[in-house]
Structures are given as structure tokens and as C-alpha cells.
Amino acid sequence: MDVFSFVKIPKLSSHRTKSSGWPPPSGTWGLNQVPPYGWEMMTNRDGRDYFINHMTQAIPFDDPRFDSCQIIPPAPRKVEMRRDPVLGFGFVAGSEKPVVVRSVTPGGPSEGKLIPGDQIVMINDEAVSAAPRERVIDLVRSCKESILLTVIQPYPSPKSAFISAAKKARLKSNPVKVRFSEEVIINGQVSETVKDNSLLFMPNVLKVYLENGQTKSFRFDCSTSIKDVILTLQEKLSIKGIEHFSLMLEQRIEGAGTKLLLLHEQETLTQVTQRPSSHKMRCLFRISFVPKDPIDLLRRDPVAFEYLYVQSCNDVVQERFGPELKYDIALRLAALQMYIATVTTKQTQKISLKYIEKEWGLETFLPSAVLQSMKEKNIKKALSHLVKANQNLVPPGKKLSALQAKVHYLKFLSDLRLYGGRVFKATLVQAEKRSEVTLLVGPRYGISHVINTKTNLVALLADFSHVNRIEMFTEEESLVRVELHVLDVKPITLLMESSDAMNLACLTAGYYRLLVDSRRSIFNMANKKNAGTQDTGSENKGKHNLLGPDWNCMPQMTTFIGEGEQEAQITYIDSKQKTVEMTDSTLCPKEHRHLYIDNSYSSDELNQPLTQPGDAPCEADYRSLAQRSLLTLSGPDTLKKAQESPRGAKVSFIFGDLALDDGMSPPTIGYERMLEENPEMLEKQRNLYISSANDMKNLDLTPDTDSIQFVANSVYANIGDVKNFEAPEGIEEPLLHDICYAENTDDAEDEDEVSCEEDLVVGEMNQPAILDLSGSSDDIIDLTTLPPPEGDDNEDDFLLRSLNMAIAAPPPGFRDSSDEEDTQSQATSFHEDKEQGSSLQNEEIPVSLIDAVPTSAEGKCEKGLDPAVVSTLEALEALSEEQQKSENSGVAILRAYSPESSSDSGNETNSSEMTEGSELAAAQKQSESLSRMFLATHEGYHPLAEEQTEFPTSKAPSVGLPPKSSHGLAARPATDLPPKVVPSKQILHSDHMEMEPETMETKSVTDYFSKLHMGSVAYSCTSKRKSKLPEGEGKSPLSGNIPGKKQQGTKIAEIEEDTKGKAGTVSSRDNPHLSTFNLERTAFRKDSQRWYVASDGGVVEKSGMEAPAMKVFPRGPGLGNREAEGKEDGTVEGGADDASVLGQGDRFLTDMACVASAKDLDNPEDTDSPSCDHATKLSEAEDNVARLCDYHLAKRMSSLQSEGHFSLQSSQGSSVDTGCGPGSSSSACATPVESPLCPSMGKHMIPDASGKGGRYISPEERAPGHPNHGATFEELHPQTEGMCPRMTVPALHTAINADPLFGTLRDGCHRLPKIKETTV
């Protein structure tokens, strides 16, 4: 016999549908045969019958079919007993409350009077039901002769004779639990009716699904409202910011995914559950009104913040953001979610993709469309790079906590236009004209009109603070007329579908309460009792006949049309409405019915001043309560600027036929496409998300995309045929002629790299409590016994004023990428905000700097320059202007020297780190970066890092050596936010390099580098850098086994002859991917700088120079090879002056330093550098000036004819192939090839076609003899044609282990471009 089996119950299942359920067919429900409705009888293994009450989830043994079985508790009994001298009172009491008689002693005074299990409620005349056990014992012992007990026998049970009272007490405290399944499976199949009916857990019990996978059930009656459920959930989940939450209905539409319907808090649960097709709906508890700043929500309510994160993860995986969520963003979010999941569960910072895939699977973190259309190996490759790049979100030396990662996750998502917003299709009614419009409603956009879906051009219709009330009227069949009353002007009238109208009204009202006034609702559901009585008549026939398939119920309707001949009683008039007569609803010519009429609006609130946080893009012009609307274009970066408030100006309306200014030329705004090598993959990506069945029918799939299953689940853009924002086929919609747009000349933003430089202090906060749900996940909460909710009128006016000032910013302005004035003005204003440590002579000129190495020295800078230095700079500036073409712009390659010195046993050594702007790319889109400033000191020019620069105060020592200082790389994010100082040891290695989403379809990282940087040109130099190597470290030539001295001796003459007199034009292709790629990979990044190169052969304007990263290593105390031979190493380098010349406007002169030897005069090879020898004979002031001038003269001739170029590896400081580690004992670092600090390594770059491309070998590979696993420079850097040969200063090559000319060799600093060279 089975453990559980059905007995005494006639089969009620339908064999045709293979389903069973309640209620049974009429005529077969006999009250005397089976249990009542909601009960089920079972039998246990002992054959005893018990019953399951599905309404209360109770399991009693009592038979509910008979009233006699409802046991009435026995009446209390009074028992008087006399103490026996031997047996006492003859019973044993337990320790429960109330005290229970455990056993009765046979032959004692209590035999026949007390029954085991009796509860002692009184002793003599004292109640002891709640008294402790010790008190009961004392009372019994105090009775010397007799005792009077008042006992009561609890409910009898069939098992009373078989179990003790103590065990019975334990069973009562821990009752038997039965897991109630959500679906009934018959013959291995789930019936459709049971599977789809998930809105009601059972009759009058609503099931609410939470985002964390749990469910809550609520019993309701006809008066239970949505607000009752929300307040109960607020109490159970310990939520403070309940204003962000709402209940929604998720409707599953065949062939069109799902659709979310907002529910008004005044609607009753009875109305919700009586909707047609309710068996295809689920009730969700969601954050529908997202905060503008997730950090603010974290401070106010950690539980709501955690809920928002879980909900956002579900929305990403379930593709609820539609096509707006690009592959790169989806992969970035997945990497963050993987990191959070691993840190939360394993308590480790090390992320393993294998562990993640085994434990959760990639489908837990990525949308199915990404998994289906991308190769698995490319997905894993991208995720591995992105997971490692997550550490770049925090300052170096700090660990990224799970809480910080969640904040960045939500910040990435907040850049999406549909995050917290919705798109609606509507018909604008203006007098007799009707035009189709697309509306965007969200916290940052207010109520905006999407003018062009291709260029994402939107215009602000109304801010939430301007909406007085919302009214809705039935129009024809499922159409509803929505009237938005804005200020005191004519209301905006829209015709919409009923479900969309309800979502628009609820979304607007919800954001109004969140951002403007939490005490007032601009969209109320009128009560039926306030409208008077009105008999149903024939005039109502057909007007509210809402069909099942197309019917989307208006939640605010108090009554609904029934089936058959039933009529609905439709009256929705608020008693506070002053202008509506009670008879209008029946005498209206078009038989319109007022569905929602708001209460009257007080004139005091209308006259409240509207705050304007931030700078208004356009000036408010009040003319008869009419203003100009802000015309703007949405972009990811402008969203950040407009995050504080959805409006930047007071907006009103001019209702006339005024067209949009034709002068607007929207730029191309969109996300960077991925999978470039596969054209058909672009078509896959474009058609990944389909919002209606018609789109699927019209989709022309390529053979490669036939197997892709498209998911139409874009619930935010829930309009079926609405065009996507980025849809290439987007068309310009009819303009709203009743609004006058003002032209705005803001620059366009096209940077989709999200800010990751937040220096969060939230890491020190306590971790938010995880959603703690009391009881089981399916416990039923009886809302019928809840007290009425209290009003929230006790809030003071200060909260209202503060909320009014915190209204979201206007739609982000449209910024023209060709506008340079805005960028310069921003740079100027940025400089004015800086704390000035010294007065600059050219303070008004915005100075662009590739890299800045702030020093740790504190204090104020020297006030002025040496007059000799000033005169020299002016002479060099004049020289630069003579060589500059008047009609062209040049590239200013500014090199910032960071002095660093160390003392070793009295031998003072000096080395200079130089960073060189060496990479040209078309990063015009990132024109928002701010310029750097130079501060003049006696050592030269030091770059002023934005907001974090410390000015060195050290003076030049007697030998002209700068003081030792520590350096760091300033990490420049991809936005205009202040950068952070990154310590020098934090250099991006190839293993930790982030991979852009565009590379997902490339075959390897090197192929992607090659593709990105094809044709990019950078200037390089072949000057040497002094370095030390530990004793005994083996060194070998870069290529072949030929010693460096031999190469030097045989090549000098050839090189000089081959390089003299050759000049050409250097050109490159602008690569749109270079900027965003470098922004994530370099330790220091400048968003976009305009560089101008001056050349005799031709001048080409380039923009978007990315700053190279530089790694600075302090000089080691150990002696190098030269010290071992007894020679002093005290090289003085002119680069220590850090000289930089400020040209006129944006033209700057390239700064370089000549390398001189001050002490190694015994080296005969030093005589080959006349300029450096001359510099050592001058005085201290003249020495610096002379060396600077001589070097510039030589460098000017060399740079005009330079040929070599290098790309990503050079600019990033050997982040790919040098292998410079933070703990490296050698001085290997990322110095550009033509830096004077970089040795030739036995090679010289010449434009001879007979040579072969060189390959770089890192010191880690040379020492143990392992082969180089990195790609060769020829593979990484294809060279464009027309490269200019270079006339160099005599390049003197030295042997690797011999005395170098200008300093010891430096490992890991030599990266060769792809050029031809001659070797011996």
C-alpha cells in the first residue's frame, strides 16, 4: 500500500483534458460524500484518515464534513486533593507553560481526578497559566494539607493515548509541514489550465512573485486594495523606500514575449483577478520607479538597493531592455555579476570561469541572444578580460567589494534610456489634427517626445513637476483618451490603448510622488460611492464591451462588463472636482465616460517656484505662460551630466504651428558595433530582439541566423511595432507643432564607456541585509484583518521643498562633435576651479598633456622661470612657428619628465622617466576631456594632474640633479569626472587587459590589436635611457647572437647615410575603436585631445590622442655592470628639466631631453655627443638652458623626418609584451622606443627595404631562455605606406655588456616598429 493514497473521494479529473481541479461539475458535489470545498481527505500508513485544508494549509485529523466533529474545548475542572504522607499529591508535572500533568501515580490522591495531559491553569485561587515552573512548584509545596487545582484537558487527539504530553507539546510547537506544489502533474504532464493560472494561488488568495524567486500569498476580500499588499510586503521585507515599489502584472502574449502592466494602488484585488486572461498573468513586486542615483538609495535603504540589484540582473538576463542592451554592455554586466556571485559565495577575489560555468552556468549571467549568436570561446575570452578589468574600478591597492561592484552594475544600467522608463505609441490630438507620436517617459526625460528614432532625438514635453493631474476617458472600444494637464495651459491630449494609457498614467504619477511631492497623487481612481447612483441603460451597450484577446483592463474601473446580457454601471466622478456635472456622463454627445478625474489643484502649489539645478541649456522665456521647450539629444555621457534633474529650464508650451529649427544637424549617435569581421552577425544583432509577431514574420533571416531563436521579451518598450532607438530604419516622426523648440549647440556625446573611477566610500558601510522573508515562501497573509492604512500627512513641508529641488535633470543636450568652443570653454572653466599653487604666464591657454606624473612632494611651486629659460623657450617657440603651416594644425607631443633619483654608497645616480604622446587615433567623439596644466619650477615643467597634483618644492641640487620623488600614473577615466592617481606599480599587463566587446568575433587579441591600430601613426625616437641590471644577469642582443658593439660599429655610417635628407608625410587612418579601447587599458587616459603635427612634407591633423601609460621603477641600490668595473655612474640628463614649451593656441613644441654624461668622461664614445659635452661645461642655469636648446634644435630636425611608429604596446607602457612586473628588480618599464631613456639594444631603425622586422624579447624571456609568446611587432603594428624616413642624431650603438654611451641599458623598454633594418 502506498504511503499516501486517495480514498473515499470520487475521481473528479477530466480524462479528456487530463486535468483535475476545483470546483467539480455541478451535481457531483455531495456534502455527505466528500469534504467541503477546499478540503481533501488523505490516509496515512497506519490507515488513519486525516484532512488537508488547502485554504489554510492545515492538516487536522478532525473530519470537517460534520458539525459534530468540530470539537468544543472541554470546560475547566476543579480538583481538590489531600497530601499523602508517602506519595504526596500523586502526580508529576512538566515544565511547559501552562504546566502539564505528565503522569499520575497509581494509588495516589490524584488517581481518577487528574488525567495525563491536563493543563494546570490555577492553583488555589492564583492563575498559573503563564507562571514559570519554579513558581508552580513553590505553590504546590506550600500546600501542606490540601490543594485545589483548576485543570483543563486540551483538544483530544487520536494519538493522545500513544504519545506523551511532552512530545505532544513538541509536535505542537513544530507542526507537520507539507510542501504544497504549485502545479498538479497527472501522468507526467502539467495541464495548461493549472500551469497558466498563477495569478491566484487559490480562490481569494493572490500569489505575488518576488524578484529573488520567492512568492507571497495574500488572502483578500472585496475591499482589499493593491496598497494593502504593498504595505504588507513593506513590513515583511523591512523596506523603507516603499515609494519605489509597485505591483505589476506580467502578461504572457503568444509570439510577442511578455508585457508588464502597472497596477494602481487604489485598485482592488477583486478587480485585478477578474480581468480576462488573468490565468495568463503573474503578479510581480518590482521597483518600478528607479532612483536617479543608486548610491543614494543604498544610503537610504540597503534592502531596497539589494532588491534593485537582483531585479536588474533578472531584467538583463531575461532581455527586458530589448535592443538597447548591446553586447558589450551585457558582457560587462555579466562580468560584474560573476564577480559579485563569486565573492559572495566563495569569499575570494579570484574568479574562475570554469568554476562559474560549473556552479551556475553562463546562462545565469548572459541573455540567451548573446549565447546563441556568439561563439562560446569568444564569450569566455571576453569575460576573462572583463573580469580582470573589474579591479580597475577601484583605486590600486584596494579590493573591489561586492557592494561596490553592485553600485557599478547599477551605474552601467542607469545609462540605458529604458532603465526605469518606457516608450509609448500614442496619437496626439490637436483640434482636428491627429498625428502619431512616440513618447519616452522616464526619470531623466520626464515626458519627452521621440522626434527621430534613428538619431535618438527627443524633445521635452513636460516635466513631472509641471503635471497637475491626469484624466482618462473611454473613446472607442479599447482606445482611451488621456489628458495631461500641464501647468495652466491647454492639456496634452493623447489617444492610446487602454493598457498603455494605464502604464503612462501610473508611471507619471509614480515619478511625481517620488521626485516632486510624496503626499499628493495626480492620478486617482474615483470611488463609485461619490458619484451618486445611476441606473444602467441601453446607452451603455457596446461602449465598454472589451473583448478578451485585445482587452487590457483599466485598473481604475470600479465595475466591469460581465458576460452575456450583463451591463456595467460606469460612473467615475470625484466629489472634489468642481467643474463636472453629474449629468454629463449620460448626456455627452459621444457618450464619453469620465473614468478618472483628479481632485482640485490648489493655486498655492501652482505658484511654487520651479528650481533649476545646474545650468539651464536654454533660457526660460515666459510669455503668457508659454516657454520654449528644451531640444536635446540623448547620449550615454550626457545622461551622466543630466542625472541630477530631469529638467534644466522651466518648460511650458506655445500651441501653434511652429516647426523645428532646420539648423539642427544631429550627429550619428549609437553604440559601437561588435563582430566586425562577420557582416551577417550585424544583421543578427540588429534583429536579436523582436517586439511583435509581425516583426518576426517580416524578418529575412540569413542562412547563418536560421538557428537563432529570437526572444521577443522587451517589456519596457511594450508597444509591439514601436521602432527601436537605435533602429537604422528609424524615421523622423511628425513634429509636435504646438511646441517651440530652442536650438541648442551642446556637443554630442558618443562615449559608451561607463565611468569606473568612483572612489567609493560605501565599501566601509555595513553590508545590506539580505531580503529576510518570515515564514515559508508561500505563507498566506490575511489582508482581510489588516487595519486601514494611516495617512502620510504628517510629513513637513521641508521634505516637499527638498524633493522639488531634487527633480531629475532635463533630457541631455545634443552636442555637436565639431564644436571646439565648448571644449575650450570647459577647459578654461576647469582651470579656474583648480587650486592654483603658482601663477602661470600662459594661464589662459588650455594645455593638453598626454600623461601626468604627480609627485609626492608637498608645498608650493616656484613663482617664476629663469629669464634664460624664458628666452630659450621663446626662441624655440619661434622656431616651431616658422616650420608650422598656417593653414594646418599640428600635433603637440608633450613629454613630461618625472625626476627620480636614488643614492648608492655616495654615488648619486639620476634617472628620468619620460612619457611620450605617441599614438594618433580618431577619438573626436571624446572631446570632453580637460586640458592639463604645467607648473614651472627650477627643474622644468611639471604636469599638474587634475584636482590631485602636488607641487614639488625641491630646488635644484648643486649638480643639477632633481630630488628623488615618487611617481604615479594618473588614471584618466572615460568621462569628465576627476581622475585618480594610480601608483606606478599598477601597470596594465596583457593578462589583465580588458577586451572590448568589439573583439568578440576576432580570432585573437593580437588580431584585434592589429585591426584596431592599422595605420595609426606615432612618433618615436631612438634615444637611450640609462638603466641598471642586477649583477650576474645574463643579457643577449635583441635579435640574433651578434654582440651589440659589433652591430654598432658596422651600422653607424650606414644609418647616418640612409637617414639623411629623407623626408615624407606621415599619415594614418582614424580608427573609431582606438579611443574607447585605450581608455580601458591605459593606466592613465585622456579622453580626447587635439594634436597637431608640424612637418615639412605635410601636415595632417589628428585628434583623440590617447595617453600612454607609464610605469616608473625606482632605481635599485644594487650595482650594475659598470659599477662592478669600478666606474662611476653619475649621468646627468637634460630630461630632468622636464621642459615643456607652450606654443600659441593649441600649437606646442615637442620637448625632448638630451642625454649627457657628467662623470664618465673617460669613455671615449661620449665624444660623439657634442651637444651633451657642451652642456656639461656651462654653469647650472646656463647648463639647463643650453642643453635644452641644443637638444631641441637637433630633435626638431630629427622629428620632422622621423619614420618609426608604434602603437598600443608602446603607448601603454609594455602592457602587452614587455612583461614589466611590479616586483621586477631591473629597471624594465614602459618607455617608448624613441625615448632618450630607452637603449637601442643593438638595433637602429632605418627605412632600408632589405631589412626584416624585429621582434621584441622581454627580459623575463631572455633570462631563462624561454621563447617569446607574444606577437611580433610586425603582426601587431602593420605600417602604412608613405612613412617618412628619419634623420637622426648620430645613433651610437654599444655592446650589451660594455659601457654604454648615455647610460646603462634598460631591459624591457625597447619595442620595435615594423620597419626594415640592416644587421651584421
UniProtKB/Swiss-Prot annotation:
Gene3D superfamilies, per the entry: 1.20.80.10, 2.20.70.10, 2.30.42.10, Phosphatidylinositol 3-kinase Catalytic Subunit, Chain A, domain 1 (3.10.20.90), Pleckstrin-homology domain (PH domain)/Phosphotyrosine-binding domain (PTB) (2.30.29.30)
Pfam families associated with the record: FERM_C_FAK1, FERM_M, PDZ
Transmembrane segments: none
Biased amino acid composition, Low complexity: 900-913, 1223-1232
Biased composition (Polar residues): 1204-1217
Gene Ontology terms: cellular component: cytoskeleton; dendritic spine; glutamatergic synapse; postsynaptic density
Top-level taxonomic group: Eukaryota
Residues of the WW domain: 33-66
Compartments reported by the entry: Cell projection, Dendritic spine
Record's keyword annotation contains S-adenosyl-L-methionine: no
A GO biological process held by the record: positive regulation of synapse structural plasticity
UniProt tissue specificity: Expressed in various regions of the brain, including cortex, hippocampus, cerebellum, olfactory bulb and medial habenular nucleus.
Record remark: domains: The FERM domain mediates the interaction with phosphatidylinositol 4,5-bisphosphate.
Quaternary data: Interacts (via C-terminus) with DLG1, DLG2, DLG3 and DLG4/PSD95. Interacts (via N-terminus) with ARHGEF7; the interaction is mediated by the PDZ domain. Interacts with GPSM2 (via TPR repeat region).
UniProt name for this protein: FERM and PDZ domain-containing protein 4
Organism: Mus musculus
Gene behind this protein: Frmpd4
